Amino acid sequence: MAGPFSRLLSARPGLRLLALAGAGSLAAGFLLRSEPVRAASERRRLYPPSAEYPDLRKHNNCMASHLTPAVYARLCDKTTPTGWTLDQCIQTGVDNPGHPFIKTVGMVAGDEETYEVFAELFDPVIQERHNGYDPRTMKHTTDLDASKIRSGYFDERYVLSSRVRTGRSIRGLSLPPACTRAERREVERVVVDALSGLKGDLAGRYYRLSEMTEAEQQQLIDDHFLFDKPVSPLLTAAGMARDWPDARGIWHNNEKSFLIWVNEEDHTRVISMEKGGNMKKVFERFCRGLKEVERLIQERGWEFMWNERLGYILTCPSNLGTGLRAGVHIKLPLLSKDSRFPKILENLRLQKRGTGGVDTAATGSVFDISNLDRLGKSEVELVQLVIDGVNFLIDCERRLERGQDIRIPPPLPNKH
């Protein structure tokens, strides 16, 4: 059970718990009174904002599109209650201009309050990235009722594996770009303690990266079970690779079909996956496991970061809302060579990656296809969108195999 300091963390606004974790347990707690979220503190600087404004002229990311000198001047001296600044939010986007044809987000949050204190920049970035969702006027819905899914069984001549993942953050502890070693270890302690309560087909064990051999880590990475080593410039520039591999690890059930990553880009990534095309079964396990993990977290006096405007709070604005990415590894040797392929994906609100994850190339015409949106639609809606979209892609591939023409579908209606 969480101690009195831990429970105060999420129970009393305006109080901040600084947990000093040692040997995997809470060693001491100090209550630090902070100002309300919107009354962010100010800090002094030696030079005017105009002298500090970053050179974004060659950048192609959402942050650069919305960070004007005026916005920078209004926000650059603010800090969240934990001391997180605007410059820390945007550093990864400043250091990584982006690809001419691939627009990245270009910013991260350091804590839950980041999205309020720097809302003048985050809100328009969120609106652009999430297909017009306006966090100032809209509310996000959550739906984890897997029984609502229609169909969900793919032709396994094309679909090699199915997977659904999300992220969850522990309220009261800084997010990975900003967390201290003690906070990161506290995240690990809280999560692993909760996961020990999983039963039945969800029961499993936790494996610390620091206790694995290089060969064991690489095998898990190659099998698509474990996150890659922190070599991505987006990850390192944001500060998420500090102290690697301290307090990082993977928990999985005995069948390796339900997994939780700890302390990579987010506090946790919850994953349901299996070989083949049974997306409905994968999503059912995902919903059941995620609900049970949240119950066990709450039972111990903690809770996930969430609000009705943004849904579940995660490090990258692209993952707000559901945090959900439902995807398949799919063979599309003919469609992938068709010039209409990118437009088809765009209209279906799908995105493609290589099978090694973000920023990787496809191998053998096998792609990772998943939903583009996270916020403004429920989990059920997004998984159904992927099911319908992947079936459309399979139909296109079959038509091309028979020498028939394919069509570009009309854009999906934008319903938030």
Swiss-Prot record:
One of its GO terms (molecular function) is ATP binding. Exists as an octamer composed of four MTCK homodimers. GO terms for cellular component: mitochondrial inner membrane; mitochondrion. Residues 1-39 form a transit peptide. It comes from Bos taurus (Bovine). Residues 158-400 form the Phosphagen kinase C-terminal domain. It is found in: Mitochondrion inner membrane. This is Creatine kinase U-type, mitochondrial. One of its GO terms (biological process) is phosphocreatine biosynthetic process. It is a peripheral membrane protein. Reversibly catalyzes the transfer of phosphate between ATP and various phosphogens (e.g. creatine phosphate). Creatine kinase isoenzymes play a central role in energy transduction in tissues with large, fluctuating energy demands, such as skeletal muscle, heart, brain and spermatozoa. Residues 45-131 form the Phosphagen kinase N-terminal domain. ATP binds at residues 161-165, 224, 269, 325, 353-358, 368. It catalyses: creatine + ATP = N-phosphocreatine + ADP + H(+).
